[in-house]
């Protein structure tokens, strides 16, 4: 098969039919990404391919480092063309890596350039693409609109004033840009900045934070504020997690000691995190939001690189906490007793957790359709094999037709072809089930499932259009 042909990843006739007739043209809701609200609002043109393609993309940075490229041409102040040339040389060696496929797919879909990126073609592609980047069709909002994206959910700190979201809500009519709340600094209470962060949260919420109860009250005010601007999700990174009973625990003392930068015991930290997550579950339930939990990841494990370059620069790895599903089971058992389990999507960076998590969510579904979901293959699992394995586990342990599907988790405006990539994997997976006689060769039945996973489920699950739908 030709590289990136119209049928790439589609290995049977049913897969081809399902993709081209039922998946390809469905709109996109990107419910978890790391685009900056300011960049969407300001809608500035990018000067060149390096700025739009390599800036902030730690997936690509990891490959560049593996190819011996100096940091000056990765995150440093090197010349933009030299950075792109270094990437082109690296991409030649990335055969078999999904970045090779994504990058060429993005080049083909956005720039209509059907050439292989290499050191020989770099200058030609650079010049041709940069000419297009100078046009209005390559401003951020046009890229979103022309990708048939209906909703973009950014990732925002509770203290964010969401000023650009407010402006976009008034001005942008072709798609929604909605905030998703991620209170990292309330979780990272041992990083030495907890006191300053509580001061900031107090100021923006208008609530004086003097103990755990008032801290949660301030957080609730931010849930209300985010809701007023269309917010429907929270997101939480738990690199590791150990459940701890919180009854009769002096949480106020733990907070005070963290503010004073005193050392907390592991038990105290686990008690605080458990209490915090339970309160966050309660708030998600109250506001009819969806809680996302990203677990089992080792972040910024290269200390010198962290100090020199900073966070989110490509020095993270898969976590190996073997009992994290067991600890989450204790958390959900406690939440069930309190009747505070919200809609939840669970992601783990370690595939060994997926089957355990899939069986866990089956124990706590509650009322409503697929209230708990096993999240799409995340980060290092964002590959054809990773996507297929997640689909297989979801289908075998729950109801695949209820799955809310793909997200980009990206910092790039050119990443939307990842939805196409996922849909191709989905259609091929389902096509194989038909070919092997495991599900009916019924286009109406199976085609609807493909359309639902591609768009309809995520539309209904999060309720981004609830007000508009109720008026129809």
Curated annotation (Swiss-Prot):
User: So what EC number does this one have?
Assistant: 5.3.1.12
- What Pfam families does the record point to? UxaC (PF02614)
One GO term under biological process is: D-glucuronate catabolic process
The record's listing under InterPro entries reads: Metal_Hydrolase, Uronate_isomerase
- Cite the Gene3D superfamilies for this sequence: Metal-dependent hydrolases (3.20.20.140), uronate isomerase, domain 2, chain A (1.10.2020.10)
The UniProt keyword set, sorted, is:
Isomerase
Copy the pathway line from the protein's UniProt record: Carbohydrate metabolism; pentose and glucuronate interconversion
- Please provide, alphabetically and separated by semicolons, the GO molecular function terms listed in this UniProt record: glucuronate isomerase activity
The catalytic activity, as recorded, is: D-glucuronate = D-fructuronate; aldehydo-D-galacturonate = keto-D-tagaturonate
The record's comment on protein family reads: Belongs to the metallo-dependent hydrolases superfamily. Uronate isomerase family.
Quote the protein name from its UniProt record: Uronate isomerase
Q: What gene name is listed for this protein?
A: uxaC
């Amino acid at each position: 098969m030709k590289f990136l042909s119209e049928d790439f990843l589609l290995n049977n006739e049913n897969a081809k039919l399902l993709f081209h007739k039922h998946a390809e043209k469905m709109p996109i809701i990107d419910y978890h990404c790391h685009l900056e609200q300011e960049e969407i609002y300001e809608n500035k043109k990018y000067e060149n391919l390096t700025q739009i393609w390599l800036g902030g993309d730690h997936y690509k940075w990891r490959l560049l480092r593996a190819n011996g490229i100096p940091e000056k041409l990765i995150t440093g102040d090197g010349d933009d063309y030299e950075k792109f040339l270094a990437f082109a040389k690296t991409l030649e060696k990335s055969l078999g890596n999904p970045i090779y496929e994504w990058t060429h797919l993005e080049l083909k879909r956005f720039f209509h350039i059907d050439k292989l990126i290499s050191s020989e073609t770099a200058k030609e592609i650079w010049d041709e693409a940069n000419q297009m980047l100078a046009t209005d069709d390559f401003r951020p909002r046009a890229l979103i609109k022309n990708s048939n994206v209906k909703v973009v959910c950014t990732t925002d700190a509770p203290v964010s004033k969401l000023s650009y979201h407010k402006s976009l809500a008034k001005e942008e009519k072709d798609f929604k840009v909605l905030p998703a709340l991620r209170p990292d600094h309330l979780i990272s209470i041992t990083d030495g900045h907890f006191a300053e962060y509580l001061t900031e949260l107090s100021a923006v919420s208008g609530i004086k934070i003097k103990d755990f109860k008032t801290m949660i009250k301030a957080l609730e005010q931010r849930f209300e504020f985010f809701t007023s601007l269309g917010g429907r999700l929270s997101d939480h990174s738990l690199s590791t997690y150990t459940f701890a009973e919180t009854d009769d625990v002096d949480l106020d003392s733990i907070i005070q000691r963290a503010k004073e930068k005193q050392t907390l015991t592991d038990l105290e930290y686990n008690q605080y995190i458990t209490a915090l997550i339970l309160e966050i579950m309660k708030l998600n339930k109250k506001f009819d939001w969806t809680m996302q939990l990203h677990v089992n990841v080792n972040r910024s494990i290269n200390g010198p690189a962290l100090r020199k370059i900073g966070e989110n620069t490509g020095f993270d790895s898969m976590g190996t906490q073997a009992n994290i599903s067991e600890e989450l089971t204790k958390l959900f058992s406690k939440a069930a007793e309190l009747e505070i389990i919200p809609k939840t999507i669970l992601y783990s960076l370690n595939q060994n957790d997926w089957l355990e998590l899939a069986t866990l969510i089956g124990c706590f579904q509650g009322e409503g359709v697929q209230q708990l979901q096993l999240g799409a293959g995340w980060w290092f699992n964002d590959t054809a094999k990773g996507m297929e394995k997640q689909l297989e586990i979801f289908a075998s342990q729950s109801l695949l037709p209820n799955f809310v599907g793909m997200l980009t988790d990206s910092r790039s405006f050119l990443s939307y072809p990842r939805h196409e990539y996922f849909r191709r994997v989905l259609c091929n997976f389902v096509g194989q089930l038909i070919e092997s006689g495991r599900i009916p060769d019924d286009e109406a039945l199976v085609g609807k499932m493909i359309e639902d996973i591609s768009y309809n489920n995520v539309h209904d699950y999060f309720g981004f259009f609830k007000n508009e739908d109720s008026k129809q």
